[in-house]
Amino acid sequence: MRNRCHGKVPSRRLFQDPPLRPEQAARLSAAFLRDVTETMRAAAASVPIAGYAAYAPAGTEEALTPHLAPGTSLILADGSVPAPAGVEGFGRCLLHAVRALFDRGHTAACVLSSDTPTLPTATLVTAATLLLTGSERRAVIGACDDGGYYFLGMRRPHAGLFADIAWSTDTVAAQTRDRAAALGLDLVELPLWYDIDDAASLDRLVQETSGSNAAPWTRHAIGALGWPVPMRSSCAA
């Protein structure tokens, strides 16, 4: 298991809607990462998985490590390795990480968004179980309600799953489903979830973590930032 390429704040949109200062967005990003890697660690108590945090650029390991759950390994995913035609941008980072995991001898690999701090451990356990009990044609996707995906797992490093994808748009999950169908994969869907990349999703996060035990590191960061903050009611999902 791995988080997606780390090193930037969750989304450029968080600087604008609502307006966050760079240090606020960075603090949230670090808290998200800790909560997600803690979720991976909790899931590992039920299924035989290993947690990784993918990062870029090289040389940032020391800055990243304090924000990871104990036992989380690092894996470089800067997209610098050769990739087939059509695999560009963020897709190169994802493919780089997936290939590296298989090169380490794992029988399955996945990419997991670090912008999903409230993702239930049970969902990750289900995803790993589906992957580990499926055939070599098995793939698993967890779509976000904004059209992206928070999870993509596979039994082989299928570069085609990352080819010709319009990254950072609301068609990413749909295009990935199309690529899986073209490759003849057995694609299984996880429950719909959400990631934090705009005012509406941040407002949802603040409300969801208020008075709950979910995402403790994120909850602490929200409290330290003096939130809940007023969000724009017009930014409904």
Where are these regions (language model features)?
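Short aromatic-hydrophobic micro-motifs that form the base-stacking/packing surface
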Residues: 110-112
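Conserved donor-nucleotide/metal-binding helix-loop-beta segment in metal-dependent transferases, i.e.
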Residues: 119-146
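Short beta-strand/loop segment that forms part of the nucleotide-sugar
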Residues: 48-57
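A short, N-terminal amphipathic alpha-helix
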Residues: 27-47
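Conserved alpha/beta core of the MobA/IspD/sugar-nucleotide pyrophosphorylase nucleotidyltransferase superfamily
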Residues: 175-237
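Short, glycine-/small-residue-rich phosphate/pyrophosphate-handling segment
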Residues: 158-179
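Short phosphate-binding loop-to-helix
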Residues: 63-108
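N-terminal nucleotide-binding beta1-loop-alpha1 segment
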Residues: 1-14
